[in-house]
Amino acid sequence: MNGIDAVVLATGNDFRAVEAGVHAYASRNGKYSSLTHAKIENGIFTFWMEIPLALGTVGGLTGLHPLVKFAMELLHKPSAKELMQIVAVAGLAQNFAALRSLTTTGIQEGHMKMH
C-alpha cells in the first residue's frame, strides 16, 4: 500500500478512503486475502492486482495545491481512469519488489540499509 498511498497523496486524493476501501475489499470473503495474483501459462508469467479505487483528477486540491498540480503534470494530466491504472501499477510494482526481496536477501536486509 505504500506505493499506492504515495501516488494517491501526491495527486491530492484521499488516501484514507483508498486504504479503507482496499482493506475492506481484501477481507470481503470473511478473511484477509491477497490483492495480487500471479500465474504462468504457456510459458508467460502474468502478475496482476485487483483493487477498488475511486480517484479524481478535477476539483479538490488538483487545481489549488502547486505540488498536486506538478504531480498531475508529471503524470501527463491523466484521466481518472488512467490515474487509477497508474496507482494500481505503483502498488503492483512495490509488491513485486517485496516478493523479490522475500525470495532473495529478505526484507530485513533492505530495511537495515536505511539505519
What kind of region is each of these model predictions?
Residues 37-115:
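Catalytic-core signal marking the mid-to-C-terminal active-site face
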